[in-house]
Every structure is written in structure tokens, then in C-alpha cells.
A protein has these predicted regions:
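Short helix-to-coil transition segments within interhelical loops
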Residues: 188-194
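Membrane-interface helix starts
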Residues: 8-23, 289
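Juxtamembrane non-transmembrane "cap" segments at the membrane-aqueous interface
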Residues: 226-237, 296-315
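Secretory targeting signals
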Residues: 23-69, 101-178, 199-279, 317-336
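Short, membrane-interfacial amphipathic segments enriched in basic
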Residues: 1-4, 141
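Central hydrophobic cores of alpha-helical transmembrane segments
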Residues: 21-25, 284-297
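Junction motif at the cytosolic side of a transmembrane helix
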Residues: 5-14, 275-279, 341-360
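Residues that define the loop-to-transmembrane-helix transition and helix capping
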Residues: 15-18, 195, 283-284
Length: 360
């Protein structure tokens, strides 16, 4: 336990970690405020709102209609707010819409701002793909201001990419630094060092990784809850995220799979980093090699398919991407299994390499 605490202290007291934690958290705040909140727009009673004001206005008008979604409620929204019809070149979304009539246009008309198609036809709930999806699972759609969850999922990917960088920079030094500073002979000269040094380093590294995962998830959750609110989680993910999925999946199930894959992504990245660190005699060299290993699957995926595609999708950089659940939903447990086996293999390989140095 003493060695574990010492290793954990070294990881958290590292200047690179302290500076990196402040920088990445700051970047997360900036991205949230300027890219997410700053991009919100809403038009109510002819008045245009943007940024935080738009969020507040959208939340306010949605409260009036919150509840089970019916054709009558859709008609009331259209009567009160109309349907949006204004588009601007190279600008996303309806420029004269709000959360409610944007929602109605997307699911109950033929309008689609992505394709520049104005709404000209109106559909009943039972005629829509949304209605059919809910009939398939035997539930009723619940109208609520779900943008908070949509932003949470978008922010999660950005936050965990930043967290991955912190893990690479922090954990890469855990073994390599001992070789670089010529401390290995001293560590292995004691009985405690020979028996407990490696388990302490590994346990400290995974604790460090779990902390980083929880930090970015928690910060993201609090930001979205405070500004957007987090309602509508009882719906299917398609309705919450405005992204079509091949089959209706409840958002909570989608979120559970997403967080589980993201957690395993960071844990496996930690295992890969430990393996490289055990082989390297330089902290800088370890960081560079791990960074290359982390980003290389993106390049491989561009040129290969088939079984290679499946293996590449199980790598850490892809498991933190929000679109991964839709891509691998039918086989997510296979992808997770590949990742777990790969992580265990890396950890064992690194452990053997580091132990070999004990007898060198």
C-alpha cells in the first residue's frame, strides 16, 4: 500500500499532469460555451435569440408541452409557432425555428434543413418512422427538452479524447522513467521492490485512469445539467440525439453502452501505455510511441475493411467516439471482448518485459 500511494502521488504531482488538467478542463469549458451553447438559436413570436438566451427560451416554451407526445399536441405547436422556412447558406438549422417547431418539422413533415427541403407535407404520429419505432417497443414518445443529453454525448467524445492525451502523457513515464533515471537496480535490490513495485505501478496507473474518466464525465454532466437540463432520457436514442439508428434503442441503454465502451477505451489505453513504457528507456520516447499507436487505427481504417475494420473499431481511439454504438450495436460485446483481450495481452507483455530487466 505504501508503494501504491507513492506511485499515485507521483502521477498526480507530475507538473505535466497539473498543467494538462487545467488546460484540458479549460478547453472543455471553452468548447461547451462557444461551440455548443454559442451555436444555439431560437425564434419565438418573431424575436430571434442566440446562445444562452436561446437555450433558456427553448427550455421555457418546451415546458408548456412537456409530456406524452400526441397528434393533438403537435397541432397545438404548429398553431402557436408555425413551421420554420428560413435557411441560410453554409449555416446549420432553420434560422426562424425553435426547439418545438424544429422537432415537429424533423419528425412530422417532409422538411429537412440538411437537404434544403422546406416542410410542405404533414404526417400523423402513426405514419412517421418515429411512431413506428415506438410501436415496435410498445412505448409512447415523451416530449421534453432533450438537447442537454444530445450535448452531453457530443461533449463526452471531446472530453475523453482530451483525457486520453492526459493518460498517454502521465502513464508513459511510470516504467520508462525508472530506466531513464537508472533507478531500476536500486528498486530491484530490495525484497519489497522486487515483489510489490510492479503491482503498485499498475494499480496506481489504473486508478489514475479511472479518475480522469470520472472527472471528464462528471464535469460534462454538471455543465449540461446546469445550462440545458437533462430531461427526456426515457425516450429512444434516435429521438434524443436526432440521429437515426437501425433499430429503436432506449436512450438509457444507449448511454450505458456508450459509457461502458468509453471506460474500457481509457482502461485499455492505460494498458497499452504501460506496455510501451515497460519496453522504453526514455519517457519522451514512450510518449511518442504510445501517441502513434493511439492514432494509427484511424489511418488503418481508411485503407482496410473486413475483419481489420472490426479489430480497428475495438481500439481505444474509436471506442470513445459517439457514433461507435450505432456502428457496432449488434456486435458491441464482440468489439468489447476484442478490446479486453488486447488490453490484457499488452499488460502481460509489458509486465514480462519489465520483469526481465530485473535480471538484466
Amino acid at each position: 500500500m505504501r508503494l501504491y500511494k507513492m506511485e499515485l502521488f507521483k502521477l498526480f504531482q507530475n507538473k505535466i499532469f497539473k498543467i494538462g488538467m487545467l488546460a484540458t478542463t479549460g478547453l472543455l469549458f471553452l468548447y461547451f460555451w462557444f461551440a455548443e451553447v454559442g451555436g444555439e438559436i431560437s425564434t419565438v413570436d418573431g424575436k430571434f435569440y442566440s446562445g444562452y438566451e436561446a437555450v433558456q427560451m427553448n427550455r421555457k416554451i418546451t415546458e408548456e408541452f412537456e409530456g406524452d407526445l400526441t397528434d393533438e399536441k403537435v397541432n397545438q405547436i404548429i398553431e402557436k409557432y408555425g413551421l420554420p422556412a428560413k435557411l441560410e447558406e453554409n449555416m446549420p438549422g432553420w434560422r426562424d425555428g425553435n426547439f418545438l417547431n424544429d422537432f415537429v418539422t424533423r419528425y412530422f413533415t417532409n422538411g429537412a434543413w440538411e437537404n434544403g427541403v422546406l416542410p410542405t407535407e404533414r404526417y400523423f404520429l402513426w405514419e412517421t418512422e418515429l411512431g413506428k419505432a415506438y410501436d415496435e417497443i410498445g412505448k409512447t414518445p415523451y416530449l421534453a427538452y432533450t438537447t442537454g443529453w444530445k450535448v452531453f454525448v457530443e461533449m463526452l467524445q471531446f472530453g475523453l479524447i482530451l483525457g486520453s492525451i492526459l493518460i498517454i502523457c502521465g502513464v508513459s513515464t511510470i516504467f520508462a522513467e525508472e530506466s531513464q533515471t537508472k533507478m531500476l537496480p536500486l528498486i530491484f535490490s530490495t525484497e519489497e521492490g522486487r515483489r510489490k513495485d510492479v503491482p503498485a505501478k499498475i494499480l496506481a496507473s489504473f486508478t489514475f485512469t479511472i479518475f480522469i474518466f470520472m472527472w471528464f464525465v462528471l464535469v460534462n454532466f454538471v455543465l449540461c445539467w446546469m445550462i440545458y437540463g437533462l430531461k427526456g432520457f426515457e425516450n429512444i436514442s434516435w429521438m434524443v440525439l436526432s440521429q437515426h439508428m437501425l433499430q429503436p434503442v432506449l436512450f438509457l441503454k444507449y448511454l450505458g453502452i456508450l459509457l461502458g465502451l468509453a471506460f474500457q477505451a481509457l482502461v485499455s489505453l492505460c494498458a497499452i501505455t504501460l506496455c510501451v513504457s515497460a519496453y522504453q528507456d526514455s519517457s519522451f520516447g514512450a510518449v511518442i510511441i504510445v501517441a502513434v499507436c493511439w492514432g494509427l487505427p484511424v489511418l488503418i481504417r481508411m485503407f482496410f475493411g473486413g475483419i481489420i475494420w472490426l479489430i480497428v473499431d475495438s481500439m481505444p481511439i474509436f471506442l470513445v467516439m459517439t457514433g461507435i454504438v450505432n456502428d457496432i450495436y449488434e456486435i458491441w460485446y464482440i468489439v468489447l471482448g476484442i478490446n479486453v483481450c488486447f488490453a490484457i495481452g499488452c499488460l502481460v507483455k509489458g509486465l514480462v518485459s519489465y520483469k526481465t530487466k530485473q535480471f538484466a
